[in-house]
UniProtKB/Swiss-Prot annotation:
The chain crosses the membrane at residues 7-27. GO terms for cellular component: cytoplasm; cytosol; late endosome; membrane. Keywords: Cytoplasm, Membrane, Oxidoreductase, Transmembrane, Transmembrane helix, Transport. Its EC number is 1.-.-.-. It is found in: Cytoplasm; Membrane. This is Putative oxidoreductase C1F5.03c. Belongs to the TDA3 family. GO terms for biological process: retrograde transport, endosome to Golgi. Putative oxidoreductase that negatively regulates the retrieval of cargo from late endosomes to the Golgi. It comes from Schizosaccharomyces pombe (strain 972 / ATCC 24843).
Length: 382
């Protein structure tokens, strides 16, 4: 009887690729015998993990996630040091601020140095929220792709572009999605038939890390998705490491609260959540151009340099949220199914740590690097 492990991961966001990486690098993982199959319907980091701000925080976490956050924050630094994350995925420390602005401001507060994209004349109040010891950032899309590539170098990894339809103990059923087939006519006919066929794959362990789509596979999990829009702006200056949680009062008294994350080569700005229903696939996520325009219009009020700069990217994604606990759901369900989802706005911060603890749970049988007792799936099951 073979003792090989055939591990399936559903979801190619930061949680899925972090699981892949730490499984592949675990000392108990047999690179000659064990396999990992990653199912992703649209591509690595195609949903929220590729469209998030990439903000990292060490301290803004409650009792249920503080231990995991400390582990994960340190892993971000270790991975950056090991693989040149500064250049490969924009890893850097940040200063974090709360800035209250008012276009009718009479007595401006002092604007922190290095934030050239906010007009000093509108700054009513500044509060430091974090510093370079406890705040940071990555470009999440670049991070996910780099970590996936590093895992693929050391493990037998198969990436399947497919829509997983169901998971059961030791088996997944899926339908292929794709255009990755030979172009001749005979192959096209075969491909069309193949794409409508439901396939099955045996697995010794199944990790469901499908974000807000996780309940499609584990229906009694109380997890939903909230859509949020963001844009990036191409400013003609090099941007220092600052995150700004703002509130601005316009001349007419209207109040808005955009969040700004300064990357080296662009300014990331996000707006508010809306109630657009979750589509069946992440690739079906709709971008409301009017909402992106509103984000830019809001940002324009902060400085002329923003008004004069073009938008590079307009995008939307769904953040996975636990309707039961408000915290991530991480752990084992049944004998061979594991779940890692509902990280909300902290998915990028908590991604590597989640991958680490799940690799321990699967290959060691217990988690030792962080305390995740309060994240057990039992608390989120109906």
């Amino acid at each position: 009887m073979s003792n090989s492990r055939n591990i399936v991961i559903v979801g190619g966001g930061i949680t899925g690729v972090s699981c892949l990486y730490f499984l592949a690098h675990h000392p108990s993982f047999n690179r000659d015998r064990d396999t990992i199959t990653l199912f992703e319907s649209a591509g690595i980091a195609s949903a929220a993990s590729g469209k998030a701000s990439g903000f990292l925080s060490l301290e803004w976490h409650g009792p249920s996630t503080s231990s995991l956050a400390a582990l994960s924050y340190n892993l971000h630094k270790e991975l950056s040091d090991q693989y040149d994350g500064v250049n490969k995925w924009g890893y850097r420390a940040l200063d974090t601020w709360s800035i209250k602005a008012d276009e009718n401001c009479q007595q401006p507060d002092k604007l922190p140095e290095g934030i050239e994209w906010i007009a000093p004349s509108i700054v009513e109040n500044v509060t430091r929220l974090g510093n370079k010891k406890n705040s940071g950032q990555v470009h999440p899309y670049k991070f996910c792709h780099a970590i996936y590539e590093e895992a693929s170098k050391v493990a037998n990894v198969t990436l399947v572009k497919g829509h997983v339809l169901s998971v059961d103990e030791n088996e997944v059923e899926y339908r292929l999605i794709g255009d990755d087939y030979a172009p001749d006519e005979e192959e096209e006919i075969t491909s069309a038939e193949e794409l409508h066929t439901i396939h099955s794959m045996e697995a010794t362990h199944i990790i469901v890390a499908a974000g807000p789509w996780t309940p499609q596979l584990i229906p009694n999990l109380r997890i939903s998705g909230a859509r949020i829009h963001s844009i990036t702006i191409d400013l003609p200056i090099k941007l220092n490491g600052n995150a700004v949680f703002s509130e601005i009062t316009y001349k007419d008294g209207t109040i808005a609260a955009p969040e700004f994350y300064a990357r080296e080569d662009e300014l990331y700005v996000c707006g508010e959540f809306d109630d657009e229903p979750l589509p069946e696939l992440s690739s079906d996520t709709k971008v409301d151009q009017d909402k992106c325009a509103l984000i830019k219009q809001c940002a324009n009020h902060f400085h002329q340099i923003i008004r004069d700069s073009p938008v590079k990217v307009r995008q939307a994604c769904y953040l996975p949220i636990s309707n039961a606990t408000g915290a991530p759901v991480i752990g084992k369900i049944g004998s061979s199914i594991y779940v890692a989802a509902a990280h909300g706005c902290w998915g990028i911060t908590l991604g590597p740590g989640t991958g680490k603890v799940l690799s321990e749970l699967i290959l060691d049988g217990a988690v030792t690097s962080a305390n995740i007792d309060l994240l057990d799936p039992e608390g989120s099951l109906e």
